[in-house]
Regions:
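Conserved beta-strand positions in the central sheet of alpha/beta enzyme cores
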Residues: 43, 77-78, 103-104, 194, ...
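Catalytic domains of carbohydrate-active enzymes, especially glycoside hydrolases
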Residues: 25-48, 98-102
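Histidine-acidic metal/acid-base catalytic patches
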Residues: 1-21, 35, 148-163, 173-312
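Active-site-proximal loop/turn and secondary-structure-junction residues that shape catalytic pockets
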Residues: 12-14, 46-48, 82-84, 107-111, ...
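Active-site acidic/histidine proton-transfer and metal-coordination neighborhood
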Residues: 32, 60-164
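Glycine-rich, proline-tolerant flexible connector loops at the mouths of alpha/beta enzymes
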Residues: 40-67, 111-112
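Charged helix-capping and loop-helix junction motifs
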Residues: 22-26, 57-64, 89, 93, ...
Length: 312
């Protein structure tokens, strides 16, 4: 058996958390449920005002989150976005206060790539010493912007053991890159991953990458998992991206002729943010349960064993 650690991402339950005033589902509910389900760690989106799914921004709240994961024997990762130094220094300290060992980020610069690359290198070089001092690993995600080779170029230039890569199973589709090409380029740097499933569809708003329950899309999720394991990855994170939708950023003529870019059923188009609150919550629960079951089944079929003790 191939031993791994298995995290789950709070994006999977984003509507439960967003509408917590009515669902009663907060970060502590999430931590408790995912521990009971057998995950060995939790990832929490902490973007924006109030730190989103973290559900609080005080020192007391951070301490309570730290205690909640420790009591259940879980590892914790936090997500932020925007590599600017002010944000990164703050979020590294938040991660450390919460007991997180990893902080994910991606760039939010709205500028030509020739400018964004050196700015991102500058930012990550500047914050790396603080992250190292506080024991927080920084991971830069291929998040709808950089191709695999560009991300590898950035991390090569940063040249810090405290700054690695997060590989997303499907985000390269938005920039017209086959996920395996992105994986090959990023492989020497990958420390964390987001496991999800997508289809590419035509919509009235243009070509879109559509999130679907795990196992219902066109991503080669089993082979991707095997390739990542062979590259040394031992911590995987399941992310339910049902009803996620993002535009394809390149002309369709430039899309690779690989199976994950075969056009899917336009009827799958769904933007969860446009659904009524109750419907979003109910359908998210079904998608999460079905997708998580498919993910666990895929792992078992391919010889993976989730270990309760930390693997990496």
């Amino acid at each position: 058996m191939k031993a791994i650690s298995l995290h789950v991402h709070s994006y999977s339950m984003r509507f439960h958390l967003r509408y917590r005033a009515s669902t009663g589902y907060d970060v502590f509910s999430y931590i408790d449920e995912m521990a009971r389900r057998g995950f060995t760690g939790v990832n929490v989106s902490a973007n924006g005002p109030g730190l989103r799914d973290l559900c609080g921004s005080t020192a007391e709240h951070f301490a309570a989150v730290r205690a909640a994961v420790a009591e259940r024997g879980l590892r914790l990762e936090l997500d932020t976005s925007d590599t600017r130094l002010e944000n990164m220094e703050y979020m590294v300290r938040v991660a450390a206060a919460c007991g997180a060992d990893t902080l994910r980020t991606y760039t939010r610069y709205d500028a030509p790539l020739r400018d964004v690359i050196p700015w991102t290198i500058r930012d990550l070089r500047a914050v790396a010493p603080l992250a190292a001092d506080l024991g927080v690993l920084l991971v830069l995600e291929n998040h709808e912007d950089f191709t695999g080779p560009v991300l590898a170029e950035i991390l090569s230039a940063v040249d810090s053991p405290s700054v690695r890569a997060l590989y997303d199973y499907g985000n390269s589709q938005m920039v017209g890159e086959d996920p395996f090409d992105a994986l090959d380029a990023m492989a020497p740097f990958i420390a964390r991953v987001h496991a999800k499933d997508h289809v590419v569809i035509r919509t009235p708003e243009g070509p879109m990458v559509q999130g679907v329950p795990f196992g219902e899309g066109r991503l080669l999720v089993g082979e991707t998992t095997d390739r990542l394991y062979a590259a040394g990855v031992r911590r995987f994170c399941f992310e339910n991206v049902w009803s996620y939708c993002a535009p394809v950023k390149v002309p369709v003529q430039q899309l690779p002729a690989t199976s994950c870019f075969e056009w899917g059923d336009p009827g799958l188009h769904l933007v969860g943010d446009r659904l009524p609150e109750g419907q979003a919550v109910a359908e998210e629960r079904v998608a999460f349960d079905d997708g998580a079951a498919a993910f666990w089944a895929m792992l078992a079929e391919r010889g993976y064993e989730v270990r309760s003790e930390p693997i990496a």
